[in-house]
């Protein structure tokens, strides 16, 4: 989940609402679910086992720049663990993310060959240079509320 400053406001509220729904689904289906938040640095939260850390996450605003490098490294590390080796990945972001080094993007292809599906949920209408690296990116458009 992209927690950079560009996600502040309506995108942040939308992302948090979706995250709450994903938590509910994981509980109902008794599925593992792991959250990796990122802006410049990353935080990892096992959302079914570490509720305190999850509540702490919801109490902090989204801030900072965006760098997906460490998030991707954390994702690949998790996918290499037995517990998550059959997992799929969902990246929630406005996709105002600078591209990573080609070797990291190549690792996405390696994991895709192992059966991992990479999905995205783009909040907003920013140009998206990541589309070719995902199996599918869903898009939610929104309008900025005007203040008078």
Question: How should these model regions be labeled?
Answer:
Residues 20-23, 29-30, 56-59, 111-115, ...:
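Short, surface-exposed linear patches
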């Amino acid at each position: 989940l992209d927690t950079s400053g560009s996600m502040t406001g309506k995108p942040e509220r939308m992302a948090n609402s979706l995250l709450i729904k994903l938590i509910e689904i994981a509980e109902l289906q008794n599925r593992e679910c792991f959250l990796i938040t990122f802006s410049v640095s990353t935080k990892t939260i096992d959302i079914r086992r570490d509720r305190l850390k999850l509540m702490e996450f919801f109490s902090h605003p989204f801030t900072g720049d965006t760098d997906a490098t460490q998030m991707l490294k954390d994702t690949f590390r998790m996918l290499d663990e037995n517990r998550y080796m059959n997992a799929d990945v969902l990246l929630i972001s406005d996709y105002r993310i600078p591209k990573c080094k080609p070797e990291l993007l190549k690792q996405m292809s390696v994991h895709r060959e192992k059966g991992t599906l990479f999905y995205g949920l783009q909040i907003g209408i920013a140009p998206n240079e990541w589309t070719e690296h995902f199996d599918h990116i869903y898009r939610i458009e929104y309008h900025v509320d005007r203040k008078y």
